Amino acid sequence: MKKFIYIILGVFAMVSCIHDESNLGEEPISRLSFVKTLPKEYPVEKMSRFVLEAPEVKQENQEKPLSYEWQIDYEIVSTEKTLSYDCNVAGEFPCRLKIYNEDGAVFYEFVLKVPYPYEEGIALLSAYGGESMVSFRNVMQEGEVFQKHVYRLNSPNVSLGKEPKSILYNANYASVYIAAENPVKVVRVDARTMEVQNVLKYPEPRLDRMIERGKYGIFFVGGGRFLNMDCKTENYINTFQQALTGKWGSMPDAYVDDHIIYYEGTWSSKTVIFDRTSKLFLVEGYMGPERVYEDILCDVLLAALPAQNSKNYVLVFKDNAGQIKVAHVGVDNVQVLSQYSDTKGSITESSCFLTSKKETLLYYSKGNEIYRYDYQSAGNFPVSSDYTVGETGDVIKEMVFDPEEEKLYVALDAASGDYKGCVYCYDLNTKALLWHERGVAGEVVRMIYKK
């Protein structure tokens, strides 16, 4: 019992001693804090020098000598009060400044943003002077203009085929794919720098179009054949094509149209093609190709575009009587929801098309006019156009939205001029023209919006 009491008394004595020592004539601790609220991001141009003086700090109780430590991308780059750093690489870099004295420290974290040369904007693939050409315009900053020949400028050692065919952006891998013929070549470039990352081993002799297959794949179509490619491995799958025209295929004369209908559900996906030979729509089934959309008597398929409902598509086609029609179809359940003839005659075989993800609207062109048709309006086609773009004689070739569907970008070919490609940008809510640039490309082939 005495031992227990002695131990307890000893503990109290030790605690008492510790408490007493903390107050025996020590100087007050110098506490640090920043004087002002500090920015979280600094934009700096590539190949320039970033200079930043350490922000002012307040030392409470006592002033003591200060030291500095600057980190960029988790590496210490300076111990001076003023940071001087050469920004030679584009990207967003986490930064941290540590200001400290012998008593403590404060930390300031921020992001150094060195923009890539080709960030969010419009990429235009065109034919100019017997070559494939890519033009680009950043759209997030005021005063930007199109830059011509951006692919050739950044990838001079890998030429494209002379006949441009298609351009596609995959946000998941931050890549742009550019396809051309003569010779057939598909390149993958960094979407932010336009520098070649890889030349794909494309196995077919023809290539007319690339079509997005969900987030992770691409359909390649050309010469009546099609493949789908996994973007991660860049391996090709052609089981559907083999079921059509392979050794044991059921339709050896099938000629796959350039427009592919694709739906990707939670647990499964569906791919529908149009065979130009048999004039049939076919879906990949367990026992081979199966006929679908039998109520649609299609002779020429002009467009196949995703509808507002992700399970549906909008088809524009010329039927076997020469009438141009618009059909609304389900892909998940492969049903024809509606089909109506264009009684106003505004749709032509050279029209280009675009569908909205916000509304049940099909945009289509005729010359330099743009019309909008509600494909749930039971065939109520518009009498007049919504937009007149450019000048008399101009011909619209491509239309795209920005991801938020706030702006409409229209690419057209001018009637004359060396560089015929022109781009117009409209506010979708007011239909007001926001800007336009003429002479920015050769003859327009494809246009994309990329983040």
Identify what each model region corresponds to:
Residues 43-60:
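A short beta-strand segment in extracellular, disulfide-stabilized domains
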Residues 68-87:
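Surface-exposed, flexible coil segments in extracellular/virion-facing regions
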Residues 154-171, 202-218, 223, 242-269, ...:
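Repeated scaffold domains used in trafficking and secretory/extracellular systems
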Residues 325-420:
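Intrinsically disordered, low-complexity segments enriched in Gly and acidic/Ser/Thr residues
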Residues 412-451:
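Blade-level signature of beta-propeller repeat domains, shared across WD40, Kelch, NHL, RCC1
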